[in-house]
Amino acid sequence: MLGLDACELGEQLLELLRLALCARVLLADKDGESTPSDEVLDEIVPEYQAPGKKSMLAIWQLDPGDVSLVKYKQALLGPLPPIMDPSLPNVQVTRLTLLTEQAPGPIIMDLTGDLDALKNQVFVLKEGIEYKVKITFKVNKEIVSGLKCLHHTYRRGLRVDKAIFMVGSYGPRAQEYEFVTSVEEAPRGALARGLYVVRSLFTDDDRLNHLSWEWHLHVCQDWKD
């Protein structure tokens, strides 16, 4: 970085700090660590002003002649994803799958088509079984922080359960991501059997509604009921 004046050097250091924060965001959920907010950073670094969010393209185009910085960005962010259709949303949720070895067949919810049609479908779950939820999604353009999936479950008009799955933070890439929850147990007993309405939401730390949909779950005594 020879030849930079003090202001330019300061901008470079701030951008490197920005990249380091991106790394913390991408790895926080794996390590179980929390990511420092801009407010905390302001206290750690006196007179620090948090930079505005930069696009992935802008980050990649920063100092293309600095070999060490280019290598650092490649290790941190991975390859620059191919140019996507600008009409595509940044986050696309494609499927929700219930994983259980006890089911007679796959239980897959396609989220790329007519979401209203899901209201007319009933997904059957045998009482008392153990299962996991797999969420399949894509990130197309920019880093997204704090993805989470919420499920509000209703029976006879009353909310009986609220589940929040912390999915994490991800950068754009051509391949889909998959997130699998920990093991859940379906309710059991005569009082638990019946039809449930589930309202699901896929959102993030910025509270953007990436996808919301409603579906029906029938807890039965047996798969054939």
UniProtKB/Swiss-Prot annotation:
Pfam families referenced in this protein's UniProt entry, alphabetically: Rho_GDI (PF02115)
Location relative to the cell: Cytoplasm
Main location per the UniProt record: cytoplasm
Transmembrane annotation, as ranges: none
InterPro entries noted in UniProt: Ig_E-set, Rho_GDI, RhoGDI_dom_sf
GO CC terms in record: cytosol; membrane; plasma membrane
Tissue specificity: Detected only in brain, lung, kidney and testis.
SUPFAM superfamilies: E set domains (SSF81296)
Domain of life: Eukaryota
Molecular function in Gene Ontology: GDP-dissociation inhibitor activity; GTPase activator activity; GTPase regulator activity; Rho GDP-dissociation inhibitor activity
Entry keyword Cytoplasm: yes
Record keywords, A-Z: Cytoplasm, GTPase activation
GO BP terms in the entry: blastocyst hatching; regulation of protein localization; Rho protein signal transduction
Family the UniProt entry places it in: Belongs to the Rho GDI family.
Function: Inhibits GDP/GTP exchange reaction of RhoB. Interacts specifically with the GDP- and GTP-bound forms of post-translationally processed Rhob and Rhog proteins, both of which show a growth-regulated expression in mammalian cells. Stimulates the release of the GDP-bound but not the GTP-bound RhoB protein. Also inhibits the GDP/GTP exchange of RhoB but shows less ability to inhibit the dissociation of prebound GTP.
PANTHER family: RHO GDP-DISSOCIATION INHIBITOR, RHO GDP-DISSOCIATION INHIBITOR 3
Protein name: Rho GDP-dissociation inhibitor 3
Classification of source organism: Eukaryota, Metazoa, Chordata, Craniata, Vertebrata
Gene encoding the protein: Arhgdig
